[in-house]
Amino acid sequence: MGYISWLGKPDTEDSVLTLLLRQAGAVFYVKTSVPQTLMVCETVNNMIGRTVNPRNKNWSCGGSSGGEGAMVGIRGGIIGVGTDVSSFPFHVSN
């Protein structure tokens, strides 16, 4: 969620998605960044600052799941799982 008060306080249990991926053999090796409260159009938080587009440092990587998008953009993993709050781009593309 990007809250600085949660820094260094990991959850004691895995989420359902994490559990399913782990059972399927996934290896978690990195964390990606999110904007504070997730509902912002740009990925900026007080822990690591601004996450930029990996192909053009002058552009944003987007908000909500921007860190995940940046990771997928540099082929840093074989799967990216992001959140979806308003589906605005989805509605426009239909």
Indicate where each model-derived feature is located.
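Structural signature of FAD isoalloxazine-binding scaffolds in flavoprotein oxidoreductases
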Residues: S87, H91-N94
